[in-house]
Amino acid sequence: MPPFLITLFLFHSCCLRANGHLREGMTLLKTEFALHLYQSVAACRNETNFVISPAGVSLPLEILQFGAEGSTGQQLADALGYTVHDKRVKDFLHAVYATLPTSSQGTEMELACSLFVQVGTPLSPCFVEHVSWWANSSLEPADLSEPNSTAIQTSEGASRETAGGGPSEGPGGWPWEQVSAAFAQLVLVSTMSFQGTWRKRFSSTDTQILPFTCAYGLVLQVPMMHQTTEVNYGQFQDTAGHQVGVLELPYLGSAVSLFLVLPRDKDTPLSHIEPHLTASTIHLWTTSLRRARMDVFLPRFRIQNQFNLKSILNSWGVTDLFDPLKANLKGISGQDGFYVSEAIHKAKIEVLEEGTKASGATALLLLKRSRIPIFKADRPFIYFLREPNTGITVFFDRIQIIYQCLSSNKGSFVHYPLKNKHSF
């Protein structure tokens, strides 16, 4: 039986920006990839919540490009929209990744990759050079026949600490525990993490229990954060005539922002908005916002889910990679036989603020007296985490329902402990 390649993408969250035509072109391509991934997941998830990290999915695919040849490499390039074999693209992405890790004024962002190699497996010197140069990567020997390898467990340890339970979290266990590694020769683990404090923090004393109308019309009482603040806001119309409000919530000491997209018509489902999202639309929204003083209401939420990326990539035309007879990954070791067995993406995201104590009476009085415009995410909405300097989308997610069991207090910050393992 030929050896196969297992790739894990271990996650948390992140983002980036640059200059000139190359920057603009790559920003659009990265955004198109993010939207393609989002729309593919949305199409099969119907009216449920989900969280994905486009940046975390694209990074390991880029590394695989260094070892892919022939139609295998072409299919990866078609899926990503670019190839790292283009020197301009390679240099641009390297410069972008070189800005990470970063830590300043309460914001922490880190991107890294580890390539665990079965002891005795020969690797192409050229592939080793590329991987070592790419996105803070490293090569480490490991016994991949043992899923509980010390090296891999160490790499996963930090993200496991924030694992939690809940109705929206999906199946338990991590992909590495669910995939046979008996014939694995390589394991690629990419980790991306983001933790940021709001530039203008939500006060726990302003958190209220307010109604949230779910996708199917069910109304739930949920903890709703609130603040009156200066924000970037805009109202737009998509190509089908649907109107949306777009709000930007920035993080302290960082260019990273959370963008929320809320249909103006309460009867417009997200499924009517999603097919009309394009990279140009996202660019217009994020660059055309204007300062406004608003009452902002945002629910606390937590999502964890797992996807089979293999089926999604197959639907995009990436098929050779998973076929032991067709996969051409000779650039990895110069040998035939490597192929990707599985591609599993697992992610978790939490948006929390300190305290759960409601202050409904005060809020009602505030709203009755205030003429300040209101942005109230009390129904299904789309949101994405983005670093405007490079336009890279770290998360692209959807909220359709807020579960009532969210009672944990973890301070007045937004935490994205993304545990994504894509097991190839």
Swiss-Prot record:
Main location: secreted
Record SUPFAM superfamilies: Serpins (SSF56574)
Gene symbol of the encoding locus: SERPINE3
Region (Disordered) residue spans: 143-174
InterPro entries: Serpin_CS (IPR023795), Serpin_dom (IPR023796), Serpin_E3 (IPR031172), Serpin_fam (IPR000215), Serpin_sf (IPR036186), Serpin_sf_1 (IPR042178), Serpin_sf_2 (IPR042185)
Species of provenance: Homo sapiens
Pfam families: Serpin (PF00079)
Protein name according to UniProt: Serpin E3
Skewed-composition ranges (Gly residues): 163-173
